[in-house]
UniProtKB/Swiss-Prot annotation:
One Pfam family it belongs to: UbiA
Compartments (UniProt record): Cell inner membrane
Organism expressing this protein natively: Janthinobacterium sp. (strain Marseille) (Minibacterium massiliensis)
This protein's name: 4-hydroxybenzoate octaprenyltransferase
Role according to the record: Catalyzes the prenylation of para-hydroxybenzoate (PHB) with an all-trans polyprenyl group. Mediates the second step in the final reaction sequence of ubiquinone-8 (UQ-8) biosynthesis, which is the condensation of the polyisoprenoid side chain with PHB, generating the first membrane-bound Q intermediate 3-octaprenyl-4-hydroxybenzoate.
Membrane topology value: Multi-pass membrane protein
Assigned protein family: Belongs to the UbiA prenyltransferase family.
Domain of life: Bacteria
């Protein structure tokens, strides 16, 4: 494997699910903030920025977890922990990607740039929250959802209360899907003393995941209704609810394969919500 391929693996370009989980909430925000008529330049900036910042986050995460990944079956072959990439290289990659992302938003208003600094700090500190915070997935939800206030800021030069409520909804969604992800590694994380929601929730994990899905859809539903979204939006939410119900069938036995499949399937849940939002605006 050549150097470029190793860097691609470091930043998970071969696993786009993480990009999509960041992108969908950002697109919800851009469409709602612009009344369904987003500036396509903004859409391009935020889409590329999502790819860059998710990639930078992966590099920072692998740097932070390099001494733990070697003890986890799923992560033992990651480039840093396997010795194929030096730790300092990962930090350099993260720095370059972050600077590129910041260059993208440089033409935007001051508020968006200020929020981007907060977003970088949150993304960079997330890997360390797993050492002491009982539910780091909630912090991840803030990191993965910070495109929401940034999107509103870029369009409206302000961040209304609705944007923060969408961020809260994204936190619930993140706790749901990343708990599914954490259930895959639960036994390894217990041995390492790592903190995850899958460990914290214990035997109530499945019930709490479903509660978080319900809160996600409920909050988004209320926010969307306030924005005047109606039939197609509701249809999108119902389709997302069907996705969540399907996840229950995958995770109720707590088998690794099913939990991982449910995590990956969240792309469809986020896409269903966006489809409902976009169609409702388009077909008015």
């Amino acid at each position: 494997m050549n150097r470029l391929q190793l860097y691609f693996r470091l930043i998970r370009l071969h696993k786009p699910i993480g990009i999509l989980l960041l992108l969908w909430p950002t697109l919800w925000a851009l469409w709602m903030a612009s009344d369904g008529k987003p500036d396509w330049t903004l859409v391009a900036i935020f889409t590329l920025g999502t790819v860059l910042m998710r990639s930078a986050g992966c590099a920072v995460n692998d740097y932070a977890d390099r001494d733990f990944d070697k003890h986890v079956q799923r992560t033992v072959d990651r480039p840093i922990t396997s010795g194929k990439i030096k730790p300092y290289e990962a930090l350099l990659v993260a720095l370059v990607l972050t600077l590129l992302a910041f260059a993208l938003i440089w033409p935007l208003n001051t508020l968006t740039k200020q929020l981007s600094i907060a977003a970088v700090i949150i993304a960079a500190t997330y890997p360390y929250f797993k050492r002491f915070f009982a539910i780091p997935q909630a912090y991840l939800g803030i990191a993965f959802g910070f495109g929401i206030p940034m999107g509103f800021a870029a369009v409206q030069n302000t961040v209304p209360a609705a944007a923060w409520w969408l961020l809260v909804a994204n936190v619930f969604w993140s706790v749901a899907y990343d708990t599914e992800y954490a259930m895959v590694d639960r036994e390894d994380d217990l041995k390492l003393g790592m903190k995850t929601s899958a460990i914290t929730f214990g035997r109530y994990d499945v019930a709490i995941i479903m509660f978080c899905y319900a809160m996600t859809l409920g909050i988004i539903g209320i926010v969307g209704w306030q924005f005047g979204l109606r039939i197609w939006f509701v249809a999108g939410l119902l389709l997302a609810a069907v996705c969540a119900a399907y996840h229950y069938t995958l995770i109720r036995s707590r088998e690794r394969a099913g939990c991982f499949a449910a995590f990956n399937h969240n792309n469809w849940l986020g896409g269903a919500i966006f489809g409902g939002v976009a169609l409702d605006y388009l077909l008015r």
